[in-house]
Amino acid sequence: MENIEEILKAHKLTMEDYEHIKKILGREPNLVEIGIFSAMWSEHCSYKSSKKYLKGFPTEAPWVIQGPGENAGVIDIGDGMAAVFKMESHNHPSFIEPYQGAATGVGGILRDVFTMGARPVANLNALRFGDVKREDEVGAHQRYLVRGVVAGIGGYGNCVGVPTIGGEVSFDECYNGNILVNAFSLGICKKDEIFYGRAEGVGNPVIYVGSKTGRDGLGGAVMSSDSFTEETKKLRPTVQVGDPFTEKLLLEACLELFKTDYVVGIQDMGAAGLTSSSFEMAGRAGSGMKMYLDKVPMREEGMTPYELMLSESQERMLICAKKGTEEKVLEIFRKWDLDAEIIGEVTDTGVMELYWHGEKVAEVPVAPVSEEAPELDRPTKRPEYLAYIKETSIDTVPHVEDQEAFEKLLGSLEVVNKAWVYEQYDSMVQTNTVKHPGTLDASVIRVKENGKAIAMSSKCNPRYCYIDPKGGAAAAVMAAGRNVAMSGARPLAITDCLNYGNPENPEVMWQFAQGTEGIKEACRALNTPVVSGNVSLYNETNGVSVYPTPTIAMVGLNDDANKVVPSYFQETNDVVYIIGDTEKEFGGSLYLKELFGKVAGELPKIDYEKELRLWNFVIEANNRGLLKAAKDVGVGGIAIALAKMAALGNKGFLGNFCFEDSREIFSETFSRALVEIDPKNMHALEELANEIGIHATPLGTVGGNRFQLCDIDMEMEKLKDIYFNTFKREIERDL
């Protein structure tokens, strides 16, 4: 093949890779085969840099039905029902083309869930943007990205009819060159009706269903495995274009198919399209496959085998059906006005054979491309900045009056209400959503089949992960679990989306290795196994990587959907308690960031026993009918958590407690919660706290038209204006 070096460079392959490919094939590869190896060995598909670190994740528990390795994780939720869930990134496409990038991220994660046999019932998203407050082009571009991404998520999810019920939105200048768009979906099915991505049974037909294949998304998997430069805008053709109405038809057709016994295996065509779906299905089953690419439904004229194998056109699935049922399968999809064609069959050769009008155009062994793809052991190095980052503390910065600090923190885009975002999403479609977004610490969906509730929350504080990559990742697991527990549910399992910079940088690889250690440690200690997840590397532009951002989505179960705990003030004269101990801990805090522009200090102490005691306390207090409301104490500390409860409940607060150093109301000590109770239940609450071994301290009472805590005194009207209106004012100021 001529110009081999240029071809390899275009496919992000090295000469070493090329020699390896020749050894596997026993000959020189052709262009189609190079395209296949390039996509399947990309970071995006093969996890070659990260796989060695993921192997130690705890993945088993009595309630885990399916752990990592399939399209999504599955847990038992009782009464013969299962919850299916996963989180994925669509970072690179969303930065290049925000609307379609975010929309197709939603589409892809929905397919991961319904390909397992589950009807999707809830979506979350975790979004990270750059500095939208800047007055220059960078700030304007970030505001454009926010508007585009949110519109894309809403546009797709709303049309498919799956509620988007929560998530998180945060901002930091480290995301100016790479935004992060992490999408989560959860579905429900019967636990004995789960489908897997396997192609087995010699002679069984391989069927293509869904949209026609076009040239959109060509090279998307390879693009997502590289860092950005100034040339990035030229990559728009590598971003897929979504059609949510077709997705809805595909969803319903698949669910109808699952009621039959025709299916051997099914796989969504995601990154690397037909290549990944076919190789993954054959790889999991240890089988081979013959595919006739001229049978693939095409949207454009003149498409080549190379393009058909690597296109990332959306809303497509690959099905392995039982021999003899193919016409019935085709009939179901055509009834839903979808393309459906038999394009191949399963073999026992362990080889993928591709044909084009009768001519063989590729012949590749399955295992070396999929299950046995190369793994890298990249060098790691502790970042130099960690040597001096702990020198900063609350005692090394100037004193700021509590009132001034409170107003600044309350107006932080990390804190203020995100109604502008979630009001663009249909959160109530399907009528299973227990409460509106923003009114609970977790997002909660009712399981109509058994009267239970599934709670879910996504969390990560990138500042914590920057100052302590291991502890910050563990803290994300704790925080996601804490949110779930605050709603009254028992945390059960996580899915993750591990967003990091360039793995070719040893310091980034060290951050990643430490992050996975933190997740392993926390999940073991808290008994919340990892059941699915995603790794997104190369989140870097012009040599600048994002902060380590291991987003954790925790899923939990509440046995009674009528016992879900809100997170805002309910009734005047109720008493508010702080549960847990407060220390003077400001490492990575919002206080240091907003008031002094510093991301530094020592991470608050991690104590898994305290965390578990807090979860047990809140869950038991709720079961005993003691709680009116519960709120996790997170960024901004007690002051900000109380302010959110007051604003959302439209009730003031009169504090009658303060710390010796009043700044501790902004401390971010872990494993704490605020609870609101009826005064008559004070004794019962304190008895339960003693029983569990956790401190419960009364802070004050609900009511009035002012917010008063230590030296803070603010009219509720002003507090509500800052909390509810700041986000919209900031994001829409260009319009």
UniProtKB/Swiss-Prot annotation:
The record lists Mg(2+) 2 as bound by 112, 268
Q: Where is the active site?
A: 44, 90
Where substrate is bound, by residue?
A: 89-92, 111, 240, 312-314, 536
Instruction: Specify where it is mainly localized.
Output: cytoplasm
Catalytic activity, as annotated = N(2)-formyl-N(1)-(5-phospho-beta-D-ribosyl)glycinamide + L-glutamine + ATP + H2O = 2-formamido-N(1)-(5-O-phospho-beta-D-ribosyl)acetamidine + L-glutamate + ADP + phosphate + H(+)
Q: Which GO terms describe its molecular function?
A: ATP binding; magnesium ion binding; phosphoribosylformylglycinamidine synthase activity
Keyword check for Nuclease: no
Binding positions for Mg(2+) 1 per the UniProt entry: 88, 534
Enzyme Commission number: 6.3.5.3
Report residues binding ATP: 47, 86, 496, 533
Q: Which PANTHER family match?
A: PHOSPHORIBOSYLFORMYLGLYCINAMIDINE SYNTHASE SUBUNIT PURL
Into which family does the record put it? Answer: Belongs to the FGAMS family.
Function recorded in the entry: Part of the phosphoribosylformylglycinamidine synthase complex involved in the purines biosynthetic pathway. Catalyzes the ATP-dependent conversion of formylglycinamide ribonucleotide (FGAR) and glutamine to yield formylglycinamidine ribonucleotide (FGAM) and glutamate. The FGAM synthase complex is composed of three subunits. PurQ produces an ammonia molecule by converting glutamine to glutamate. PurL transfers the ammonia molecule to FGAR to form FGAM in an ATP-dependent manner.
Q: How does it assemble?
A: Monomer. Part of the FGAM synthase complex composed of 1 PurL, 1 PurQ and 2 PurS subunits.
Q: Which NCBIfam families match?
A: FGAM_synth_II (TIGR01736), PRK01213.1 (NF002290)
The protein's matches in HAMAP family, at most eight in alphabetical order, are given as: PurL_2 (MF_00420)
Q: What is this protein called?
A: Phosphoribosylformylglycinamidine synthase subunit PurL
User: What organism is the protein native to?
Assistant: Nitratiruptor sp. (strain SB155-2)
The gene behind this protein is purL
